[in-house]
Amino acid sequence: MSLKFARILGVNVTIENEENILEETRKYFLKSEIPRLIRGRRNPKSEKKSINPLIIFTPNPEIVVLAQKDDEYKRIVNSAQINLPDGAGIIWAVNRLEKVKIRRVSGADFMLHLVKLAEEKALTIGIIGGRGGLAVEAIECLQKTFKDVKMEALGEPEIDTKGGQAIDSENYFQNLKNDIDKRKIEILFVALGFPKQEYFIENIKIQISKSKKFRPIILMAVGGSLEYISGRIPRAPGQMRRAGLEWLWRLARQPWRIRRQLAGGEFFIKVLMTPNKKLLF
């Protein structure tokens, strides 16, 4: 991919506008269309060629702080082809350290863009995670707007992780990969919260990569986006989102997030202590 990144405290952050990032996802599916034809015949070499899953994460200050303390987690986050700049803290850090002004790319909004893309290209979407039937509720809400999209809930797994490895779950991921193949899922949204969802995506990516099949799939960590989409939690007003205060809105409705905000304070201090360097690549 040709997207530009900045490295913030060792974590890659995509520094492109939303449309450029979305265009890369379109290109991913365009390059992967099968079967490829040569003079009206299938090209067996193309059909045998495998393609890597396209990984999309949404690193926020808390994720960056954890990545600094956990090298394996940092490796996983940095392995993503797209790391959306979702959050005022990340935008501020990129501006301060890289002297680059970028706009926020909301993970929840980008998820909706991918659902629209799925409708345009007749792709099948899978959603995994969310508690108490949240994925099913989100699908019902999405299908009111995107009536022609095929979407399926794939369960609410309780997968423990340690050091980047899923515990006693190899069979689960193998079965999940088989289920993804059977249902022909081409976009998989994982809503397990960090860091579990990033570890989860790494494990399913490994299983998918083993198959060596020429079939594209996007794996995106969507965190709390299902709560917004389902209507369980109202989104902050547009003015608050534009001002970078959506975190305050969520904190007021979910006080348990205070521990995460403390990690955000640690991020703020570390950025202030980091010399300004241009680390674009």
Residues of each region from the PLM?
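Short, basic, low-complexity termini and linkers enriched in Ser/Thr/Gly/Pro
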Residues: 1, 31-37, 41-51, 144, ...
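N-terminal nucleotide/polyanion-binding subdomain common to many enzyme families
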Residues: 1-38, 48-109
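Short glycine-rich anion-binding loops that position phosphate/pyrophosphate groups of nucleotides
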Residues: 60-64, 192-197, 225-226
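A transmembrane-helix-recognition feature enriched in membrane-embedded lipid enzymes
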Residues: 89-94, 235-281
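Conserved beta-alpha
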Residues: 91, 95-176, 183
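Short Gly/Thr/Asp-enriched flexible loops that form oxyanion-binding sites at enzyme active sites
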Residues: 139, 198-207
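Short, flexible loop segments at boundaries between secondary-structure elements
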Residues: 156-163, 211-253
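Proline-aspartate-enriched helix->loop->beta-strand connector
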Residues: 184-194
